[in-house]
UniProtKB/Swiss-Prot annotation:
Keywords: Cytoplasm, Exonuclease, Hydrolase, Nuclease. Belongs to the XseA family. It is found in: Cytoplasm. InterPro entries: Exonuc_VII_L (IPR003753), Exonuc_VII_lsu_C (IPR020579), OB-fold_nuc-bd_dom (IPR025824). This is Exodeoxyribonuclease 7 large subunit. One of its GO terms (cellular component) is exodeoxyribonuclease VII complex. One of its GO terms (molecular function) is exodeoxyribonuclease VII activity. GO terms for biological process: DNA catabolic process. Heterooligomer composed of large and small subunits. The gene is xseA. It catalyses: Exonucleolytic cleavage in either 5'- to 3'- or 3'- to 5'-direction to yield nucleoside 5'-phosphates. It comes from Klebsiella pneumoniae (strain 342).
Length: 463
């Protein structure tokens, strides 16, 4: 009989699948160094080879989409460093590795060190954006840490002279390649921070191999860049070259020339902006002056419409119309009187009664006298009313008020000043006098205190 709990029974397929999953899950991606042998490339474009050392060997495959990124042709017996995934080929149960990238052994070791240092500094937070310092805008002085004989310095100076010829540049010469280079770069950064001569630093060099650029993958250089109080722009190699210094720096430039463009101002662009600003300012000033002129013209015409002389001229015109009407009325009455007189004379001539003639003549004389008196009275009354109107107009005229020693004070917007709360110290005031204008500045404001009239004390009645 079978026991109650029998052990798990695997099929061959399940066994190979389980082993493959264990290898891929537990091992993950690893770096392997070894010597290439049995290298082959069939028509599919994939690479098949064996990696071996003195004691063991393992089958490898590198598919076409991965090997197209390799920059050299692998050779039999060549030492390489590969990054690969461990797996199992299930149909045959063969253990193998799938290669993702390949480098010659020398560069491969450097790349491995690069990845290890990058992971370490990432874990410490040296690459985080919150530690990045803002570059000065504009920069008043630029420091350059590079080789004094390299092409990078020439490119940087050429760009700075072209874009911003007046920008001061301080060069901190240092080696950028070799065993002494990291220490010299660190000392140059410390010297620049101690002197505080510039407000931005460019640290970099021209292009080269990974080994040539290795000084900028040094941990000491990375920590010196991170500790710098002066913002640093890294400019190492070409755009495809990425170093540890690029991650730590406050800003990465793809090339030294690009770094010079980043920290400098384009004088031609500044000049164009200034000219554009000047044009906008002139247009705004022209518009402002034109609007002020229109406003002044409107106020001038409005003031002219309300001028006392104009009002007096209107009154004189009205008075002249009244005088004409009065003259016409008098002439009309005189004509009617003459006509009545003629009719009366005709009747007298017809009847010729002498007494009635004498009486009629007396009556006519009386009427003429009364008419003349009436006309003189009405003329005198109209003259008196006209004189009173002229006197009243002169009494209420603002010019007459100014002539008596008074003045009218207004603030900048033309509002007549009536109370001290309308102004504050430093305001400009305009005062109209009889013969001109006075502009003044408020130095002090002193309100007049209101006094209350005392009630008379009650008098004691006389005993």
């Amino acid at each position: 009989m079978l026991p109650s709990q029998s052990p798990a029974i695997f099929t061959v397929s399940r066994l190979n699948q389980t082993v493959r999953l264990l290898l891929e899950r537990e091992m993950g991606q690893v770096w392997i160094s070894g010597e290439i042998s049995n290298f082959s490339q069939p028509s599919s474009g994939h690479w098949y080879f064996t990696l071996k050392d003195d004691n063991a060997q393992v089958r490898c495959a590198m598919f076409r989409n991965s090997n197209r990124r390799v920059t050299f042709r692998p050779q039999h017996g060549q030492q390489v460093l590969v990054r690969a995934n461990i797996t199992l080929y299930e149909p045959r149960g063969d253990y193998q590795i799938i290669v993702e990238s390949m480098q010659p052994a020398g560069e491969g070791l450097l790349q491995q060190k690069y990845e290890q240092l990058k992971a370490q500094l990432t874990a410490e937070g040296l690459f985080e954006q919150k530690h990045k310092q803002a570059l000065p805008s504009p920069a008043h002085c630029v420091g350059v840490i590079t080789s004094k004989t390299g092409a990078a310095l020439h490119d940087i100076l050429h760009v700075l002279r072209r874009r911003d010829p007046g920008l001061p540049v301080i060069i901190y010469p240092t080696a950028v390649q070799g065993d002494d280079a990291p220490g010299q770069i660190v000392r140059a950064i410390a010297l620049a921070n101690a002197r505080q001569e510039c407000d931005v630093l460019i640290v970099g060099r021209g292009g080269g191999s990974l080994e040539d650029l290795w000084s900028f993958n040094d941990e000491r250089v990375a920590r010196a860049i991170f500790a710098s109080q002066i913002p640093i722009v890294s400019a190492v190699g070409h755009e495809t070259d990425v170093t540890i210094a690029d991650f730590v720096a406050d800003l990465r430039a793809p090339t030294p020339s690009a770094a010079a463009e980043i920290v400098s101002r384009n004088q031609q662009e500044l000049l164009r902006q200034l000219q554009s600003g000047q044009q906008r300012l002139e247009m705004a000033m022209d518009y402002f002056l034109a609007s002020r002129q229109r406003r002044f013209t409107q106020l001038f015409h409005r003031l002219q419409q309300q001028h006392p002389q104009l009002r007096l001229a209107r009154q004189q015109t009205a008075l002249e119309r009244l005088r004409q009407r009065m003259r016409i009325a008098v002439e009309s009455q005189l004509k009617r009187a003459e006509q009545r007189q003629k009719r009366t004379v005709q009747r007298l001539d017809h009847y010729n009664p002498q007494p009635r003639i004498h009486r009629a003549q007396s009556r006519i004389q009386q009427l003429e006298y009364r008419l003349a008196e009436n006309m003189r009275g009405r003329l005198s009354e109209r003259r008196e009313r006209f004189g009173n109107a002229v006197t009243h107009l002169e009494a209420v005229s603002p010019l007459a008020t100014l002539a008596r020693g008074y003045s009218v004070t207004s603030v900048n917007d033309g509002t007549v000043l009536k109370q001290t709360k309308q102004v504050k110290t430093g305001d400009l005031l305009t005062t109209r006098l009889k013969d001109g204008w006075v502009e003044s500045e408020v130095k002090q404001i002193a309100p007049v205190k209101k006094t209350r009239a005392r009630k008379p004390s009650p008098t004691k009645p006389a005993e």
